[in-house]
Amino acid sequence: MKGSSEHGETSKQAPLGSSRGVSKGVSVLDLILRFIAIIGTLASAIAMGTTNETLPFFTQFIRFKAQYSDLPTLTFFVVANSIVCAYLTLSLPLSIVHIIRSRAKYSRLLLVVLDAAMLALVTPGASAAAAIVYLAHKGNVRANWLAICQQFDSFCERISGCLIGSFGAMVMLVLLLLLSAIALARR
């Protein structure tokens, strides 16, 4: 009889240890996703912020220039990605604390709120930039806006590529919110 009750006690403690392992795994995944989102937002902000192209027109003295700062939407894109990148970098130590102390509830709740705010910032920046990129490629016949990508092809390729990192960061922030919700629900 005594042997069977001891066996039952050990089996009750096994899920508790595995719960800590799962919690630590969630925290490690949180840290990895933050690094990926940092890379995406940083690359997008730098690439967009350094995008420009100059085309000569008849002579060397008359030139047409396209740069990201010509469009306020693309400037907002750079600012939004820079802010989100700075936040994600500053949140790394807190994410490391969650790996060490998986029971930190209030700091995880703070990260949920701030992650949601950063998602709310990067989403309109990326979406508005996507609309401008679409107009640059296709134009708008009704508004008499011509597509500029036939002339400024390098500029258009670069601003199109910048969207990838930003939309990737959006996905990472959504996954971070889901992971934090899972971690908070387990407590």
From Swiss-Prot:
Residues of this chain annotated as glycosylated in UniProt: 52
GO cellular component, one term: plasma membrane
One GO term of the biological process aspect: cell wall organization
Annotated NCBIfam families: A_tha_TIGR01569
Record flagged with keyword Protein biosynthesis: no
Family under the similarity heading: Belongs to the Casparian strip membrane proteins (CASP) family.
Bias kind Basic and acidic residues: ranges: 1-10
Cellular compartment(s): Cell membrane
Region of interest (Disordered), residue spans: 1-20
Function: Regulates membrane-cell wall junctions and localized cell wall deposition. Required for establishment of the Casparian strip membrane domain (CSD) and the subsequent formation of Casparian strips, a cell wall modification of the root endodermis that determines an apoplastic barrier between the intraorganismal apoplasm and the extraorganismal apoplasm and prevents lateral diffusion.
Protein name per UniProt: Casparian strip membrane protein 1
Keywords for the protein's UniProt record, in alphabetical order: Cell membrane, Cell wall biogenesis/degradation, Glycoprotein, Membrane, Transmembrane, Transmembrane helix
PANTHER family in the record: CASP-LIKE PROTEIN, CASP-LIKE PROTEIN 1U1
Topological domain ranges for the Extracellular compartment: 49-75, 137-162
